[in-house]
């Protein structure tokens, strides 16, 4: 899914809302997010330029239950680059290694920094 679409990523942080009610269960839940290069870092234009808006992918999220934030992105999060999606690009496609499915390993801490961009709701249908 190419969400949230194309926008000026150097000025705005595109935001979308997802209804995950059917996925939340009583007890402990796990939230996994797969980030791709998308419009932010993919090859663009006839020159094949990359990283037009930056080199590092990032996520800002908040999970709410009954209108109350129960999980917010922060420095306690962990990340890994060892999943089955090895490479992805809007023009060059995706390299997927099915041998790595379910083998997420190499978790490490994440770098946090304050958001300085204007959070902008995207004009796309929530998924």
Kindly label every feature range from the protein language model:
Residues 107, 111-127:
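Edge strands and adjacent loops of beta-rich recognition modules
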Residues 1-102, 107:
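Accessory beta-strand-rich segments of carbohydrate-active enzymes
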């Amino acid at each position: 899914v190419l969400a949230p679409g194309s926008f000026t990523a150097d000025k705005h942080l595109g935001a979308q809302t997802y209804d995950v009610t059917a996925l939340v269960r009583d007890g402990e839940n796990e939230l996994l997010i797969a980030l791709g290069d998308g419009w932010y870092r993919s090859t663009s234009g006839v020159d094949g330029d990359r990283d037009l808006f930056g080199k590092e992918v990032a996520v800002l999220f908040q999970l709410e239950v009954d209108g109350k934030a129960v999980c917010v992105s922060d420095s306690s999060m962990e990340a890994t680059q060892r999943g089955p999606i090895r490479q992805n690009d809007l023009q060059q496609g995706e390299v997927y290694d099915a041998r790595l499915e379910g083998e997420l390993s190499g978790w490490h801490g994440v770098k946090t920094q304050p958001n300085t961009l204007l959070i902008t709701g995207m004009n796309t249908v929530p998924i």
